[in-house]
Amino acid sequence: TPIRRQRQMCIRDRDWIAKIASSSKSKVSTKSSLYADYFFLNKLSIHLYMSNSYVNDSYKTFSRIVKYHKNDKSKFFVVHDDIDLSIGKIRLKCGGGHGGHNGLRNIIQHFGEDFYRFRIGIGHPGNKDLVTDWVLTKFSPSEKNTLDNAFIKFHNSLDILAKDGIENCQKFLNTD
């Protein structure tokens, strides 16, 4: 349930989607057949979906969205939390492993590794034995502030992605 996944980005994602939709004067709709909340950024021609399924069942949403759009999975971007990035860092890459992320593991099992990902850092506790508890804890006020700033960068990156392409978006996100 969302209450138990406090550190994971799923709760913040809903806030981010609502903010992006609001700033673009778009309405968030639920598409239950896709297991997702959805809106279209008209000026950018970008569709954003927020999965309503459990993280471990992420492929359900991903597969239905790909099928719904009659499109190739290479045109889709998965946004996920990443404990291997410091909090608030955002990276864009294509391919790679799951890094222990169960949602990615689930998508990779069904679709392979060849898709783009926006990786949003949530930090690491410093000891692998503490990871499970770490991803279930709430963010501190300072961490929330850092993530709010990351949201602004993420939102700007969508503009760059739509107008200037993937390479420029990667340059924007992957350099600090």
Locations of regions flagged by a protein language model:
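Short, conserved active-site loop motifs that form the nucleotide-linked donor/cofactor pocket
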Residues: 7, 45-46, 76
